[in-house]
Amino acid sequence: MADQLSEEQIGEFREAFSLFDKDGDGSITTKELGTVMRSLGQNPTEAELQDMISEVDTDSNGNIEFKEFLGLMARKLRDKDSEEELKEAFRVFDKDQNGFISATELRHVMANIGERLTDEEVGEMISEADVDGDGQINYEEFVKCMMAKKRRKRIEEKRDHDGGSRTKSAGPSAAPASKRGQKCVIL
């Protein structure tokens, strides 16, 4: 993943990382991670930092090596690109550009990509993503739905990569009772 970074980006990240690597051993503490990221223009929340730390600090030693940090920054940059992709995807669905995806707009876009949906299916998709219950999907709801889909995909990929005995259809993330996840997958 870090191989997707330019030499200039790697140099910038190394410089920021080095500022906090006080003893020059090539690692920083997890507590310093937020400070380093903020110095690079990122603004992670405390919860995001905890997620990143648990993802990166695989040996739970409280230190993050530069290589791990590069992987993390590459993911953050890719996620930033993903945000632009989400905005563009939302605009595709939001035909009248009013900031909401209606059932009619959803049905129209899905039909254009070859998915003929019944009124009931469209209604289920809307209600699964419609957190505020107004009968439409706003941008925040769209993002939550898509991010949930992305998380499920990462979990499945990790499970497959780890060689777990569970299949993609096993476990709570793919259980039929979890309609929310299944409906968002179509979006």
From Swiss-Prot:
Biased composition (Low complexity): 169-178
Residue numbers carrying N-acetylalanine: A2
Binding residue positions for Ca(2+) 2: D57, D59, N61, N63, E68
Compositional bias of kind Basic and acidic residues: 154-165
Residues annotated for Ca(2+) 3 binding in this entry: D94, D96, N98, E105
Source organism of the structure: Oryza sativa subsp. japonica (Rice)
Main location as per UniProt: membrane
Coiled coil residues, start to end: none
Residues with Cysteine methyl ester modification: C184
Domain of life: Eukaryota
Residues engaged in binding Ca(2+) 4: D130, D132, D134, Q136, E141
Record's protein name: Calmodulin-like protein 1
PANTHER family in UniProt: CALMODULIN (PTHR23048:SF53), MYOSIN LIGHT CHAIN 1, 3 (PTHR23048)
InterPro entries associated with the record: CALM/Myosin/TropC-like, EF-hand-dom_pair, EF_Hand_1_Ca_BS, EF_hand_dom
The keyword Acetylation appears for this protein: yes
Molecular function as annotated in GO: calcium ion binding; enzyme regulator activity
Membrane association type: Lipid-anchor
Primary role: Calcium-binding protein that binds and activates CAMK1, a calcium/calmodulin-dependent kinase.
Domain spans labelled EF-hand: 8-43, 44-79, 81-116, 117-152
Propeptide: 185-187
